[in-house]
Amino acid sequence: MQKKPWFIVGLVVCLSPLAGGCGGGSGAGGGMDATQIPPGPNGNPDGHCAVPSAGLAAVTASPTTVVGTGNAASCTASAVVAAIAGGGVVTFNCGPDPVTITVPEIQIFNDGGLGDGSVTIDGGGLITLSGGGANRILYQNTCDESLHFTSSRCDLQNTPHLVVQNIAFADGSTPGDATALGGGAIYVSGGTFNAFNIRVTNSTQSTSHGDWAGGAIYTVEQSQPVFVVNSTFDGNVASSGGALGSIGTSWSIYNSVFTNNATLTAGDGHAGGAIYNDGNSYTLSICGSDFEDNVAASLGSGSIFEVVDDLKGALVIDQSTFTGNSNTGSVQSSSHPSIYVEATDKAGNGGLTITATTFN
């Protein structure tokens, strides 16, 4: 019997008519591991928050490049690297069964895409890209000259537009260079980024430092809010923000799951077992999501740690659940021990709005 693509489950949840509202190093080498391990269903099956159009999956019916010719052996790491380097819409034809492809760090070029810097990677619910525990999986940086400068102010540009959807990432690890500050699986500095129906597991940002974060994903200076929709983050580890970390990024997280993510236990940082945010003038909006058994050490905040340096931000949580998140530090909200937010100049945990949400 053929295994069914898991992305169908997430799509049904997203488009449910019962939905409610919510605010808010490189190289082409590497081998292929054709293990038949299905990524599994993604997102929160109990999350029914309506997703704005900006957060919906990209249209991939007419791909720029298709990786593979219908069987697992044709889906090599070098083919994946070349397809993504070319930009545009990348899909996969690796046969009817789930396939894991172990890849080197894949670069997102600033001038890729169809003249607009767009890169969409759609795994069709059957593909896992793995770093093999040796390297990060995706790398986007508008200020990395090797990725081709496209403007005189690389820190302010809003391209490339990177979208990952219906795909899993596993066993990513930060490199020992200047980008080791975050993103065990995915690093995005500049441009824009969205994730729809993805799963990130067992990925690590392994260097201990106060602002270094994001075992799964790390973003820097995003000109538009990052949408994370119908996605699952499990077993990721970082200095702070076991799953997600960022500087200067607004997030819109819908119908997603964060489980068993953790911070490192020695050195600096260690805030936000699941999410760590820092920077100026941004908002973290969460709706229909589940946070369970995430752990933080040192500074604490078992699930979410947010500091907006200019005190012009907010943390908005709606229709979500927090269960079994823990920390060994003292920095946390008195009313919601797994959360800490300092987002406005109001006394206490200013900028925090929570509705229809349970804490256990």
Task: Kindly give the residue locations of the regions a language model identified.
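Short glycine/acidic-rich loop motifs that flank beta-strands on beta-rich extracellular proteins
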Residues: G131-N135, S173-T179, T204-A213, V237-L244, ...
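Glycine-rich repeat segments that build the extracellular carbohydrate-interaction surface of secreted
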Residues: T65-G70, A85-V103, S118-G125
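Bacterial Sec-dependent N-terminal signal peptides
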Residues: L15-P39
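Right-handed parallel beta-helix/beta-solenoid
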Residues: M32-S78
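Bacterial N-terminal signal peptides that target proteins for export
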Residues: M1-V9
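Hydrophobic helical h-region of N-terminal Sec-dependent signal peptides
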Residues: L11-V13
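Right-handed parallel beta-helix
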Residues: G123-G125, P160-S173, T192-S206, S223-S239, ...
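Extracellular beta-strand-rich solenoid/capping regions of secreted or surface-exposed proteins
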Residues: V81, A85-G86, T102-T120, T128-Q165, ...
